[in-house]
UniProtKB/Swiss-Prot annotation:
InterPro entries: MnmA-like, MnmA-like_C, MnmA-like_central, MnmA-like_central_sf, Rossmann-like_a/b/a_fold. Belongs to the MnmA/TRMU family. The gene is mnmA. Catalyzes the 2-thiolation of uridine at the wobble position (U34) of tRNA(Lys), tRNA(Glu) and tRNA(Gln), leading to the formation of s(2)U34, the first step of tRNA-mnm(5)s(2)U34 synthesis. Sulfur is provided by IscS, via a sulfur-relay system. Binds ATP and its substrate tRNAs. This is tRNA-specific 2-thiouridylase MnmA. GO terms for molecular function: ATP binding; tRNA binding; tRNA-uridine 2-sulfurtransferase activity. The lineage of its organism: Bacteria, Pseudomonadati, Pseudomonadota, Gammaproteobacteria, Enterobacterales. Keywords: ATP-binding, Cytoplasm, Disulfide bond, Nucleotide-binding, RNA-binding, Transferase, tRNA processing, tRNA-binding. GO terms for cellular component: cytoplasm.
Length: 368
């Protein structure tokens, strides 16, 4: 008597990646079911329509593939474990990454537990562009095959046990191949554009959205030389290295180089700017990271040579990591790096393997 197929619950977002993931798993002989997660309670018509359209697309794909679609509401968990923390970070003048938090708290915690306990799943699957490899009994997280789409940066908080319970079918493919499969199958999501914007909250005017929850606190814009040259509407709307949306032109000395945010003085509510994207004040020689997560869940001690990304899609930066204590490390770059931003994540790699990462607590500025 042959063993019954393993049951996989695919997180169906209404997008092309999760749609094709479900089909690929069917081809591999798994018993596949879908789950649509509602993680945000919409409070205006436009948002409601987008969420309803995503659910309709997910349902249409499941109908086409002949699989059941479950739905679950994680809005309370999202608010408590992702959104409130996201607002706290912004209030403190830092720039958080909600997608990383959402993966940690919702997709690979609430969803994983619900799929296993309520739906009897052996595995969950998502449309993330990452791969897993099992080495010496431990699952490792690898970059996705498509370098342009690799999403390991967003999944560094996962431990080997979570990865062992997760499948990432499109991680072995390039995006154009995924779209081609969807087109060949006649899936409604084949030409749907990729979602951007805050995880689950969708595409909307970020400034308007943040303004609903955090009161704007206007303050001065000051140059690195101490000249006041404008007013900002709130430090939370600005991030290091930002060029657009400052509302300031050239200066009295006639230099037309664009202005960049090089620092935030949170205590005095001052935005500090300089001209030129390689201004020394924008450069860092390293960083201190905290809230560390290592995929192998082994504590890090000593020193390590590896590469780091301080933001998504950045080219890997060779670096040396030194352990400061159990939950803090110092990272020294081989070459200075622009716009290292507290609140964002530093994620470490050894070749194709994502080792883990942490939150940037402070940058180590280039002193000239």
């Amino acid at each position: 008597m042959s063993e019954s197929p393993k049951k996989v619950i695919v997180g169906m977002s209404g997008g092309v990646d999760s749609s094709v993931s479900a089909w690929l798993l069917q081809q591999q002989g798994y018993q596949v079911e879908g789950l649509f997660m509602k993680n945000w309670e919409e409070d205006d018509g436009e948002e409601y329509c987008t969420a309803a359209a995503d659910l309709a697309d997910a349902q249409a794909v499941c109908d086409k593939l002949g699989i059941e679609l479950h739905t679950v509401n994680f809005a309370a968990e999202y608010w408590d474990n992702v959104f409130e923390l996201f607002l706290e970070e912004y209030k403190a003048g830092r720039t958080p990454n909600p997608d990383i938090l959402c993966n940690k708290e919702i997709k690979f915690k609430a969803f994983l537990e619900f799929a296993a306990e309520d739906l009897g799943a052996d595995y969950i699957a998502t449309g993330h562009y990452v791969r897993r490899a099992d080495v010496n009994g431990k699952s490792r997280l690898l970059r996705g095959l498509d370098g342009n789409k690799d999403q390991s940066y967003f999944l560094y908080t996962l431990g080997h046990e979570q990865i062992a319970q997760s499948l990432f079918p499109v991680g072995e493919l390039e995006k154009p191949q995924v779209r081609k499969i969807a087109e060949d199958l006649g899936l409604v999501t084949a030409k749907k554009k990729d979602s951007t914007g805050i995880c689950f909250i969708g595409e909307r005017k970020f400034r308007d959205f943040l303004g609903r929850y955090l009161p704007a606190q206007p303050g001065k814009i000051i140059t690195v030389d101490g000249d006041e040259i404008g007013e900002h509407q709130g430090l939370m709307y600005h991030t290091l290295g930002q060029r657009k949306g400052l509302g300031i032109g050239g200066t009295k000395d006639g230099s037309e180089d664009p202005w960049y945010v090089v620092d935030k003085d949170v205590e005095n509510n001052v935005l500090i700017v300089a001209q030129g994207h390689e201004h020394p004040r924008l450069m860092s020689v390293g960083l201190i990271a905290q809230q560390l997560h290592w995929v192998d869940r082994e504590p890090f001690t000593g020193t390590l040579r590896c590469t780091v990304k301080t933001r998504y899609r950045q080219t890997d930066i060779p670096c040396t990591i030194n352990a400061l204590n159990d939950d803090r490390i110092e990272v020294i770059f081989d070459e200075p790096v622009a716009a290292v931003t507290p609140g964002q994540s530093a994620v470490f790699y050894s070749g194709e393997v994502c080792l883990g990462g942490g939150i940037i607590e402070q940058r180590l500025p280039l002193t000239v």
